[in-house]
């Protein structure tokens, strides 16, 4: 198993190999060996990710988020159903971890909702739990930033998410 500091490179390698497989398939190249390598790399990432993200700082969390989230689309149709399910299960395991940067936690929560790994109700409950008084304002702000990503459309489509965020913001002490 790779050590925690190698995981971003492993994720980057998964992305590169997935791209190569897609290009190779269109050019009718023999990609069997490469597909086997991709399977193994995804499985290795699934094993290593939970330990790798715990205790990372904000910068590393953003780096992990930008590497983890696209992989579901990149490996789609390139790995076995079992490996794909293992990847999805790993995302759900990551959602239950407590000691990771807010941005990464928020981005993973949004990704899980977008991929239908969690229900809309579970998404709303996670949002409400995150914005509860027990979490630091800085961590929550980073979580919301990660959750919203580059788009606040989730707030438009879910009145509950909007109300929860609005209640949290209006409840903050003015500076």
Segments and roles (model prediction):
Residues 1-175:
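Extended repeat-based interaction scaffolds and adjacent low-complexity, acidic/S/T/P-biased segments
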């Amino acid at each position: 198993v790779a050590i925690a500091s190698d995981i971003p490179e492993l994720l980057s390698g998964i992305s590169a190999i997935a791209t190569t497989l897609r290009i190779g398939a269109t050019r009718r190249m023999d990609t069997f060996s490469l597909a086997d390598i991709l399977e193994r790399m995804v499985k290795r990432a699934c094993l290593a990710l939970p330990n790798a993200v715990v205790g990372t700082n904000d910068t590393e969390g953003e780096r992990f988020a930008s590497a983890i989230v696209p992989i579901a689309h990149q490996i789609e149709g390139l790995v076995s159903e079992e490996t794909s399910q293992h990847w999805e299960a790993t995302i759900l395991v990551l959602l239950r971890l407590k000691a990771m940067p807010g941005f990464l936690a928020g981005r993973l929560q949004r990704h899980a909702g977008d991929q239908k790994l969690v229900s809309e109700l579970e998404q709303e409950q996670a949002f409400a739990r995150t914005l509860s008084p027990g979490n630091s304002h800085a961590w929550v702000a980073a979580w919301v930033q990660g959750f919203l990503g580059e788009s606040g459309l989730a707030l438009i489509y879910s009145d509950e998410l909007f109300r929860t965020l609005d209640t949290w913001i209006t409840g903050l002490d003015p500076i």
